[in-house]
């Protein structure tokens, strides 16, 4: 290997931390084209995770490293959200962390790359596209309900508790329960009213907004009194969320029969 090529290799390996994934897009941008990549693979310096993604040979990489690669190298808006983000924030202490499943979401139409879907991460990536918020909310901004956590040698963007709970409510009643949603809200003592207000005003789902306010009023944390409900569009008409349930007349949604509301 020539001196220049050896220098490029040394530079790459020195600046490639353990546990990190590099995409072919990133490598090409840094001046490592297909020929370099193939030679590094042949000489056992790097290994392909799948088409378009690489790790250092013999290195162990996690699902979080894959997500970090998407966010930082591939302009993806995929992030940890919903119930998993709630658990990360410690807002669901009574729940046992499900290490076998991670909720990953995007607010724009995109798909996980094949290498991320096919690789065995030892967890199930429960990926969904949710158009829950207006598209003018820039991804990753703390002011739009995101935060950054460090886990498994990776630094990843996840939903802050306010946003995560709204994402979670979108799963009711199909894959989340009323009782669990109420118990999680009981732990949401320290939500930021300004953030809640901002996200509710920019949420596109009437169901989610009504459910959030239903639970928030029911638990009645101090931050709830600081919300300006007049600025939140709740639409008109009833929404049957739980069949054969009872009606919460204020928010026009049906809830389970054991709740103290009028039967529908």
Language model feature labels by segment:
Residues 1-83, 189-206, 263:
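Short beta-edge/loop segments at beta->alpha junctions of small alpha/beta modules
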Residues 16, 26, 36, 43-45, ...:
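Bulky hydrophobic/aromatic packing residues
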Residues 19, 99-100, 248:
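Sequence-level motif detector for i,i+2 pairs with an aromatic at +2
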Residues 24, 38-43, 48-137, 253:
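Short gly/ser-rich loop at a beta-strand->alpha-helix junction or flexible surface loop bordering the NTP-binding
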Residues 139-264:
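Hydrophobic alpha-helical interaction segments
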